[in-house]
């Protein structure tokens, strides 16, 4: 890529045209125009050599370092992405908004809600739970200690993690894996 400068600025090398010394780079109008033109021409991530050439060319219009060029392109890409995201979100939000007619128009079908049925899925079938779901619910209603005792009794075998050669060990009850939509 070739970079050409068509003329010198009347400002010369005076710290970016501000007239004051500052730690922050303040680009001149000419520097911004050239950087913007390069960006619009498709240059998004210049190589190290390209950055060096650009900063040399831009130094005719004011103080500039290679890092300024590098960060300008990084920031400009980020701003462009942000704008695209915002436009996309605004577009999606606009097209997914229900119309006022949809919001205020209620049909008879909407008013007649069906009773929701809660279904328990058996993810980890265990015989002691299969045949005693109602018994478990009753035990839960009576109290947490009785429920724990019931669980310990129904799950303690010589091969159970709740048993240590016949001696009971204190463990929390197994997780309730029923799906609840309340």
From Swiss-Prot:
InterPro entries: HD, Homeodomain-like_sf, WUSCHEL-like. Residues 1-24 are annotated as: Disordered. Keywords: Developmental protein, DNA-binding, Homeobox, Nucleus, Transcription, Transcription regulation. Residues 20-84 bind DNA. The keyword Transcription regulation applies. GO terms for cellular component: nucleus. Gene3D superfamilies: Homeodomain-like. GO terms for biological process: maintenance of root meristem identity; positive regulation of stem cell population maintenance; response to auxin. Coiled coil: none annotated. PROSITE patterns: HOMEOBOX_2 (PS50071). It is found in: Nucleus. One of its GO terms (molecular function) is sequence-specific DNA binding. It holds the Pfam family Homeodomain. Specifically expressed in the central cells of a quiescent center (QC) of the root. The keyword Disulfide bond does not apply. Disruption phenotype: Abnormal quiescent center (QC) in the root apical meristem (RAM) and defects in cell differentiation. Belongs to the WUS homeobox family. Transcription factor, which may be involved in the specification and maintenance of the stem cells (QC cells) in the root apical meristem (RAM). This is WUSCHEL-related homeobox 5. It comes from Arabidopsis thaliana (Mouse-ear cress).
